[in-house]
Amino acid sequence: MTDAPALRITVASASHVPALSDLLSTLFAQEAEFVPNHAAQCRGLSLIIENPSIGHLLVAHAGERAVGMVGLLYTISTALGARVALLEDMVVAPTHRGAGIGSGLLRHAIAHARSQGCARVTLLTDETNIGAQRFYARHGFVSSPMKPLRLLLD
């Protein structure tokens, strides 16, 4: 029996965009609110990568293959008087789930947010995704009394 290789997580570059878009398609296919759209996903990923003040994308690698990702988008909380992060698009390839990659990505994302001066990390999950809610609770996340609302702009 051989040990699994150490989890390698890097900040995404432009060369990661196609693989990250594939991971997003997996995620969006299982979320109630989104539909996979490769062109839109590539545009969004590229906007983040090209503008690090907006956020960072972190990539988990198995060898040379991207097998997981998570995004951190930055804003300011006037309540905290500090920079905060919105954690988005956390996904691990189905073939690599259950191996600790998600936990490693999340720990790395939290540490990365701290290193960027963030005072809080906020995330959203599907209301019915109890497994994800339990996963995040195991990592210290708690429910918020705030309810997200959206307005799509043309």
Model-derived features: where do they sit?
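Conserved beta-strand in the GNAT
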Residues: 59, 65-74, 86, 91
